[in-house]
Design a protein with these regions (language model features):
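General beta-strand structural signal in soluble alpha/beta enzymes
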Residues: 84-86, 212-217, 251
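Active-site glycine-centered loops adjacent to acidic/histidine catalytic or metal-binding residues
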Residues: 218, 244, 416
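Short glycine-aspartate micro-motif
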Residues: 108-112, 168-172, 238-242, 248-250
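Glycine-rich phosphate-binding loop and adjoining helix at the ATP-binding site
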Residues: 132-237, 379-391
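Short, acidic, Ser/Thr-enriched surface-loop or helix-capping motifs
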Residues: 124, 181, 252
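Glycine-rich phosphate-binding loop of actin/hexokinase-like ATP-binding domains
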Residues: 231-292
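Hydrophobic "anchor" residues
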Residues: 129, 186, 257-258
């Protein structure tokens, strides 16, 4: 992995007009316009999900004949989308080739724009990590500054690792706000001033004209990361819950993101749980985020500590320079502080009550808890589990697993890379045969 030096701001080549409709840019489908059939894509999806496959594996996992499988494999080999790898020994002495994605097909970039940071990753087409970088940043600085920095860093990551920008075929971007996925724009984001309907795709496309650019909500992107490399791998029906500055859910239905009719499915942070409750940045009162997101946890704990209920938290507050964070509440809880334990349990209860409704409605196989606040640990997780089990139907929770993310803060960039790959392959289908 190359080292990244300070990147000088690059002048934008002009801001696209916001008065014109903005559509997902389609630079090119697969490199060299290698369109594939829906049958071929099904084989590609299997390899992406499970790893290398033999012909016999493809026959087992599909309804296709061996003749059709052979035809699809030959076509994918000719298009250089997959490659034949080492032969595997089977009982009886017969050896069979395995097939995997061709990493040399191009590069994919994943960008996770958080409220206070940006994380970037470049991988090859097989999903192999080539370089990763992260740095603090404020999304409140606005799209021109943030996207300029993102693109500058991507250029630097490519050049310092001898990767051609012309081979960058896809860029997936996750942002912490509602996204109209059909056009790739952020819509009325509560914590992203200046981003409303800003042409993110067109701006990034000016820097990387050979790349297909796709934008989605950060929680959807994290859910993609979790089902590709995390706890949810090979789980077709899953809910990923991010608990951080805000709270959101990414819904995976039959292996795909469910976005709803306008792209805002899963925005559970703005479900009312405490009426009349505190005013939320969205304009409503008593939203889940006002009682269970990171800032809300810290604020509730601080007010109680200042009222004399927790000397430990008050000491942490003064030690940090009159700042109390959700992680400080976790530290106090681990030291046995009764107030901190109470605040975490109540927050978990609020979250669990909302998730119980989702479990009854959607019946997922797994709920994965991620985001910075998940670092509060098992006390939070057990409170969420208890509420879900208490308020959900027994049949809906019979096989339900509620677990922490296995890939933690990397879920966003991993998911963004897979978002780019999903988009490229989805626009590369040339026929249904």
């Amino acid at each position: 992995m190359g080292t990244l030096r300070e990147v000088l701001p690059k002048r934008l080549k002009g801001i696209p007009s916001q008065d014109k409709p903005i559509w997902l840019h389609q630079a090119e489908a697969l490199p060299h316009r290698n369109f594939i059939t829906s049958s071929e894509k099904e084989l590609v999806d299997l390899v992406r999900t499970y790893g290398e496959f033999t012909k016999a594996d493809f026959v087992t996992y599909t309804d296709y004949s061996r003749t059709k499988i052979t035809s699809c494999i030959d076509s994918l080999l000719n298009k250089k989308i997959i490659i034949a790898n080492k032969a595997t020994e089977y009982s009886g002495g017969r050896r069979s080739k395995t097939f995997g994605l061709n990493g040399n097909l191009g590069y994919l970039a994943g960008v996770d724009i958080g409220a206070t940071s940006i994380d970037l990753e470049i991988a090859d087409f097989s999903g192999r990590l080539l370089v990763r970088y992260a740095e603090p940043a404020s999304v409140k600085d606005g799209p021109i500054k943030v996207l300029g920095r993102v693109c500058s860093l991507l250029e630097k990551m490519l050049s310092e690792n001898n990767l051609s920008s012309e081979k960058l075929t896809g860029i997936g971007i996750g942002v912490p706000g509602p996204v109209d996925f059909s056009v790739g724009t952020v819509v009325s984001p509560p914590i992203m001033p200046g981003w409303d309907r800003y042409p993110v795709i067109q701006t990034v496309q000016q820097w990387f004209p050979s790349a297909n650019v796709v934008v989605d909500n950060d929680v959807n992107v994290m859910a993609l990361g979790e089902i590709n490399q995390g706890a949810g791998k090979r789980i077709p029906n899953l809910i990923f819950v991010k608990i951080g500055t805000g709270i959101g859910a990414g819904i995976i239905c039959e292996g795909r993101i469910y976005r709803g009719s306008s792209g805002c499915a899963g925005d559970i942070g703005h479900i009312s749980v405490n009426k009349p409750g505190l005013l939320c940045p969205c304009g409503n009162q008593g939203c889940l985020e006002t009682v269970a997101a990171g800032p809300a946890i810290a604020d509730r704990a601080l007010k109680a500590a200042q009222a004399g209920r927790s000397p430990i938290l008050l000491n942490l507050y003064e030690k940090n320079g009159t700042i109390l964070r959700a992680e400080d509440v976790g530290i106090a809880a681990r030291e046995g502080d009764a107030l901190a334990i109470e605040v975490i349990r109540e927050s978990g209860q609020f979250i669990g009550d909302v998730l119980a409704s989702l479990v009854n409605f959607y019946n997922p196989e797994m709920i994965v808890i991620g985001g910075a606040v998940s670092n509060l640990g098992n006390l939070l997780l057990s409170s969420i589990r208890q509420a879900v089990l208490h308020r959900s139907l027994p049949l809906a929770t019979r096989d339900l697993k509620i677990v922490f993310s296995e890939i933690g803060p990397d879920a966003g960039v991993i998911g963004a890379v897979n978002l780019a790959m999903d988009y490229i392959f989805s626009m590369s289908i040339g026929s249904t045969s």
